[in-house]
A protein has these predicted regions:
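Soluble, non-transmembrane alpha-helical interaction regions
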Residues: 9, 25, 30, 107-109
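Amphipathic alpha-helical segments
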Residues: 18-100
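Basic helix-turn-helix/winged-helix DNA-binding cores
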Residues: 9, 13-16, 23
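Bacterial Sec-dependent N-terminal signal peptides
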Residues: 1-10
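Amphipathic, charged alpha-helical segments and their helix-to-coil junctions
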Residues: 13, 34, 42, 87-129
Length: 129
């Protein structure tokens, strides 16, 4: 558990925080908001699946680190492939929002998607001090 919370609860809190931040920063009207979060939720399932597959590949690598070079190389390659697949579905979610948002909103959204994780890590680090 991270900082005394179970991982599922932390994910839910992060999702809620992200949703609030997106609404505030993007200043969407009601119609945009409905379309945006509907598409966002659709893509969340693909991202969740890709994350699970990446986690499984990492676990397999971790458990098999003492295997021979060929098996180890194969496991490492699988991790790389799953990581790329995850990044692709995240990019697809970002691209899916282009025709829902104005150009300015879309630019802000892209920045938010790429900076959010860093901002959350910094906030957690500062909270620990």
């Amino acid at each position: 558990m991270l900082y005394g919370q179970n991982p599922e609860k932390m994910r839910e809190r992060l999702k809620a925080y992200k949703k609030i931040m997106l609404m505030e920063k993007l200043n969407m009207n009601e119609e945009q908001s409905i379309k945006f979060f509907s598409r966002y939720a659709e893509h969340e399932e693909f991202i969740k699946k890709a994350k699970i597959e990446l986690d499984q590949a990492v676990d397999m690598l971790e458990q098999g680190v003492v295997l021979g070079k060929a098996e180890n190389d194969k496991a490492i390659q699988l991790v790389f492939e799953k990581d790329i697949a995850l990044k692709k579905v995240i990019i697809e979610r970002i691209k899916a929002m282009k025709n829902v948002l104005s150009e300015k909103q879309y630019g802000k959204y892209v920045v938010i998607e790429y900076k959010l994780l860093d901002d959350v890590k910094k906030a957690i680090k500062n909270r620990r001090k």
